[in-house]
């Protein structure tokens, strides 16, 4: 089982993030990930990229479920007004 901070660190180490928030209960996590790496990618491609970063933790069973919102920096700025 992973802790929220561990999930955040793994994502941050594997993906350049302008903004990253992770919340969870040890089994299910939610993440808001803002990365310039998402520019030009579909929602599915973005999620696949995050899943790639976390693959070994999913495969080992340490991480069970992650729901995510993925945004480019421009999308994030626009959403915040």
List PLM regions with ranges.
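Short, internal active-site loops enriched in acidic
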Residues: 27-28, 37, 72-76
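C-terminal structural segments of small proteins and small subunits
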Residues: 51-81
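A short interface-forming secondary-structure element
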Residues: 32-45
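Charged, amphipathic alpha-helical segments and their flanking helix caps
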Residues: 43-53
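N-proximal, solvent-exposed amphipathic alpha-helical segments enriched in charged/polar residues
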Residues: 1-18
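Short edge beta-strands and adjacent turn/loop segments
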Residues: 14-30
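Solvent-exposed beta-strand sheet faces enriched in polar/charged residues
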Residues: 23, 32-34, 69
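Histidine-centered active-site/metal-ligand motif
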Residues: 28, 47, 64
């Amino acid at each position: 089982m992973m802790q929220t901070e561990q999930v955040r660190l793994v994502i941050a180490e594997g993906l350049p993030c302008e903004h990253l928030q992770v919340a969870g209960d040890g089994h299910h996590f939610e993440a808001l990930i803002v990365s310039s790496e998402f520019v030009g990618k579909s929602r599915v491609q973005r999620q696949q990229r995050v899943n790639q970063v976390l693959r070994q933790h999913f495969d080992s069973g340490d991480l069970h479920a992650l729901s995510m919102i993925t945004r480019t920096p421009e999308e994030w700025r626009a959403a915040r007004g």
